[in-house]
Amino acid sequence: MKDNILSALKEKISRQNWESWFLDFNVKKIEDKHVVFEVGNIFIKDRLEQKFSKIISKVVKESLGKDATFEIVYKEIDITQENEEKGPLVRKRPLLITPLNPKYTFENFVVGNFNRFAYNVFLEASKKPGYYNPIFLYSGVGLGKTHLAQALGNFLLENDPDLKVAYLTSEDFMNEMFYAIKNGTTEEFREKYRKKADILIIDDIQFLIGIKSAQVELFHTFNAIHEAGKQIIICSDRTPQELKDFHSRMISRFQMGLLVKIENPTKEDLFKIGKKISKLKGVEINDEIIDYISSIYDNPRLIHGAILKLIAYKNLYGSLNLSIAQSILTNPSKPPKALEEKLIEILSDIFECSPEEILSSKRTKNISYARKVGMYYAAKKLNLSTRDVGKVFNKSHSSVVQNISQVEKLIKEGNIIIKNYLKQIDKATKNFAQGESI
């Protein structure tokens, strides 16, 4: 009977749809007049229920009677269990073509109704890279696209360090292309992504709007990677159709795979995100404050920034209540100036150099020290991510990581000069924070 049902269903489904959605579709069991179908993942389950439920129901009723029913189940993936079963292994060093932020993982991604579908798609793609290809992920600003995309890259590297993952923004791609053209290294640039990359993740694709030369280069890169069966992830703040001035052939490439949307989160979703962030940072912020934050901000990125600002205050003073939180976040007479923005001015005073010099590429001793110590302080005391530290200091991610590492080494060696500088910064920052909270 199982084979009969599948054969009857196959006759009613086009070849293209069958090969796209039904290759892992099986009859798990038949109980009385109820058929349980099984598929490989929740993504396929959702698609089958949305697009083919009427056809499946018709075949089941024709085979078992008018009162016959069916359901579709999927094999769940348990990342934790799988990692435990593998046990401790000696890992090779990942072969990163471009850096990933190790803080972006599936485990610390807060899942709600607004992003559950996107989360499940990326989780499944991590198990079968290249199976859903390309994946075009879009949403409003600050809803978790970058987190999901990098979580996929980190997961793949964790399970196969030999993979070569390339993560970059479209602006990075464009700048690297122009640099290659200027320096006569175009072939090396093309080989880096077309031949060496196993996974290509392009973030903020909308920044290539109107840049025809970069679009052409990306088109050929896309084709080379896709034809090799390697995974491509495209992230955008809009749908492919809304990418105005993009060449139609590029848009058609984006549409040939999965279009995945992250919806707008509810207040309940934002509250969960706030709780998760404070937990991950190891700082307890009471529910009353988090509830307030989730009522005034409408996306996870703003929630994250608000939580970090309050954590910085709590680390400095040891206490935090709703009144103080409201003052820090919504002072109407004096917009709160983030500590990280003030940090450059503090460094300028302590190291006797201008803010412009700190943000420049100059490497004189006092400027270099100001930059290194400032990056360390921003990351360790103000809880900024290395990516955000890079934005504050106008430096690349790799440069930030290197400078922080150098300061950590000096501290471990007992360098008194560095420790004194950190104390001065700490004192100045506390004075500034006190002024902001009044």
Swiss-Prot record:
InterPro entries: AAA+_ATPase (IPR003593), Chromosome_initiator_DnaA (IPR001957), Chromosome_initiator_DnaA-like (IPR020591), DnaA_C (IPR013159), DnaA_dom (IPR013317), DnaA_N_dom (IPR024633), DnaA_N_sf (IPR038454), P-loop_NTPase (IPR027417). Residues 1-68 are annotated as: Domain I, interacts with DnaA modulators. GO terms for molecular function: ATP binding; ATP hydrolysis activity; DNA replication origin binding; lipid binding. CDD domains: AAA, Bac_DnaA_C. SMART domains: AAA, Bac_DnaA_C. Residues 315-438 are annotated as: Domain IV, binds dsDNA. One of its GO terms (cellular component) is cytoplasm. It is found in: Cytoplasm. It comes from the Bacteria. Keywords: ATP-binding, Cytoplasm, DNA replication, DNA-binding, Lipid-binding, Nucleotide-binding. One of its GO terms (biological process) is regulation of DNA replication. Residues 99-314 are annotated as: Domain III, AAA+ region. ATP binds at G142, G144, K145, T146. Gene3D superfamilies: 1.10.1750.10, 1.10.8.60, 3.30.300.180, P-loop containing nucleotide triphosphate hydrolases (3.40.50.300). Residues 68-98 are annotated as: Domain II. Its main location: cytoplasm. HAMAP family: DnaA_bact. Domain I is involved in oligomerization and binding regulators, domain II is flexibile and of varying length in different bacteria, domain III forms the AAA+ region, while domain IV binds dsDNA. Oligomerizes as a right-handed, spiral filament on DNA at oriC. Plays an essential role in the initiation and regulation of chromosomal replication. ATP-DnaA binds to the origin of replication (oriC) to initiate formation of the DNA replication initiation complex once per cell cycle. Binds the DnaA box (a 9 base pair repeat at the origin) and separates the double-stranded (ds)DNA. Forms a right-handed helical filament on oriC DNA; dsDNA binds to the exterior of the filament while single-stranded (ss)DNA is stabiized in the filament's interior. This is Chromosomal replication initiator protein DnaA.
